[in-house]
């Protein structure tokens, strides 16, 4: 949500927006936490980056985290900007605790309509269905942790802790659902003021719709006092080690690297050097999913090898290309990615569209790619291509949010055997980040000459063929593979990497062992 705002503020200072633990791409805690815990984790981020004096901005729940950081680190935090500073009455807290409980998942997808309406009713001026979609996508991305942040916010004694803050505070108060509650903060601050923002211009989404204006308000306040020279000390960056499960075996780390179209996000498991007895495995996801699809199987296969799962450009957290591209272009990016890792040999694993990327990658790196494993092989007839192109069209966002419900119902028939609705929702929620590139993956897949390109591959190929929407198409791979086989998997389907992880991993492990 802060992307455009960060660009403005980052013109003359370091600007960082960290995902709270359990939200965005930050690793979740094992159980619900309180605002004090969120603030402590953010303090650890500052320490690990070697950051000295800072200014802190928070919005809604983030305002409470900002106040707590200021109290925990009074000599480090210089000034605070709060976008809304809600001080609740006890009756309001009881009401909010009831209203902001999780919405149960519904097989018909109606929970998405409820969530959409919750955000739509408080949209700010200039916020259209596209922006509301982004807000919804971020909200449901947290899954069952959706309500953890709200419950922590309602448990926090915000008024009392606000009184303790001795740093200067600017409260930006748009005319939104917290405007009345924010006015109560006026008499609680030692050194602060509330700036009421015009209701016809500012509200939810103002960081996206009016980033220049918001940045101007913030910059004027922060720059009113001289800064210290130790805001960031590059020599200290990364020197402070924080105890973290990120060092534990089987931990899936998230990182970014540069690509030809911006930042490329990827997940990886990197076991200790002594345990790396097998070639690295690179995984390519289906469209419009992300590398998140491989997390559970990465933990099993990553015990004796490096396993990486990059998000294809335009999906997950990877930045999109400027226009629709082809499978060959995706493979070029993944070629760069592998070469940057310095791997001499790799095995690759592609899921649906990712199977085509894996195939094309062999054509780019025939000496490095030793084995190709495919989760389905999309080999279409001309009639099937015409049908798929008609059904997998770009999504049009509607003000009532029914496009999400319709898409949920579109994929629902392919719910895999024994796949819990929670797993289906997690996979589906990844697709909700539909920006302009949503349909580009399908477009590229339907344009790719899979049979022709696969027939030219002389590396060993294993096609895992579960009973899903590509079952019949994948059988055709047996007629074009030079080396390898199609492995039919009756009783398996979508979600099998989560519901039958060990069985799928065992088949892959045996195939790539030579």
Each model region followed by its residue ranges:
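Active-site loop/oxyanion-hole signature of alpha/beta-hydrolase fold enzymes
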Residues: 16-59, 207, 212, 270, ...
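Conserved serine/cysteine hydrolase catalytic core
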Residues: 141-187, 433-479
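Conserved hydrolase catalytic core segment
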Residues: 52-91, 344-383
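Catalytic active-site module of serine/aspartate enzymes centered on a nucleophile-bearing elbow/loop
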Residues: 192-246, 484-514
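N-terminal cap/lid segment of alpha/beta-hydrolase-fold proteins
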Residues: 239-264
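Conserved HGGG/HGGXW glycine-rich cap/lid loop of the alpha/beta-hydrolase fold
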Residues: 1-27, 267-317
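Conserved loop-alpha-helix segment in the C-terminal half of the alpha/beta-hydrolase fold
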Residues: 7, 169-208, 299, 461-492, ...
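Helix-rich cap/lid subdomain of alpha/beta-hydrolase
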Residues: 83-136, 142-151, 375-428, 434-443
């Amino acid at each position: 949500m802060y992307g455009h705002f960060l660009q403005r503020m980052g013109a003359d200072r370091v600007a960082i927006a960290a995902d709270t633990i359990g939200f965005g791409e930050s690793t979740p805690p094992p159980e619900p936490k309180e605002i004090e815990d969120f603030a402590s984790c953010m303090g650890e981020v500052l320490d690990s980056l070697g950051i000295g004096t800072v200014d802190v901005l928070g919005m809604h729940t983030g305002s409470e985290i900002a106040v707590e950081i200021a109290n925990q680190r009074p000599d480090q935090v210089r000034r605070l900007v709060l976008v809304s500073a809600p001080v609740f009455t006890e009756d309001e807290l009881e009401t909010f605790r009831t209203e902001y409980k999780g919405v149960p998942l519904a097989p018909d997808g109606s929970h998405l309509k409820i969530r959409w309406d919750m955000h739509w009713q408080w949209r700010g001026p200039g916020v259209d269905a596209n922006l509301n979609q982004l807000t919804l996508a971020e909200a449901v991305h947290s899954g069952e942790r959706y309500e953890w942040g709200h419950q922590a916010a309602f448990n926090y004694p915000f008024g009392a802790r606000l009184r303790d803050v001795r740093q200067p505070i600017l409260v930006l108060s748009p005319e939104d659902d917290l405007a009345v509650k924010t006015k109560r903060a006026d008499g609680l601050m030692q050194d602060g003021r509330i700036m009421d923002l015009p209701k016809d211009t500012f509200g939810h989404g103002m960081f996206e719709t009016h980033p220049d204006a918001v940045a101007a308000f913030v910059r004027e306040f922060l720059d009113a006092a001289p800064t210290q020279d130790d805001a960031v000390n590059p020599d200290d960056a990364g020197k402070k080690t924080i105890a973290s499960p990120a060092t534990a075996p089987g931990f899936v780390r998230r990182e970014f690297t540069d690509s030809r179209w911006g930042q490329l996000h990827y997940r990886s498991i990197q076991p200790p050097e002594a345990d790396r007895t097998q070639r690295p495995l690179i995984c390519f996801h289906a469209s419009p999913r992300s590398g998140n699809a491989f997390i559970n199987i990465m933990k099993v296969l990553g015990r004796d090898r490096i396993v990486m799962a990059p998000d294809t450009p335009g999906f997950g957290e990877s930045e999109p290309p400027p226009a629709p591209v082809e499978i060959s272009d995706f493979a070029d990016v993944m070629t760069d990615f592998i070469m940057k890792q310095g791997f001499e040999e790799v095995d690759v694993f592609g899921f649906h569209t990712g199977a085509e990327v894996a195939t094309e990658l062999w054509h780019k790196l025939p000496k490095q790619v030793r084995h190709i494993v495919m989760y389905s092989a999309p080999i279409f007839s001309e009639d099937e291509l015409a049908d798929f192109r008609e059904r997998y069209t770009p999504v049009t966002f509607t003000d009532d949010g029914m496009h999400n419900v319709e898409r949920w119902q579109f994929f629902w028939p392919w719910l895999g055997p024994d796949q819990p609705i929670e797993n289906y929702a997690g996979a589906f929620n990844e697709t909700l980040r539909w920006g302009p590139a949503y349909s580009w993956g399908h477009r590229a897949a339907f344009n790719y000459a899979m049979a022709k390109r696969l027939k030219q591959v002389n590396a060993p190929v294993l096609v895992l063929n579960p009973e899903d929407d590509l079952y019949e198409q994948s059988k055709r791979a047996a007629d074009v593979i030079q080396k390898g086989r199609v492995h039919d998997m009756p009783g398996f389907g979508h979600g099998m990497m989560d519901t039958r992880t060990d069985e799928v991993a065992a088949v892959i492990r045996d195939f790539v062992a030579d």
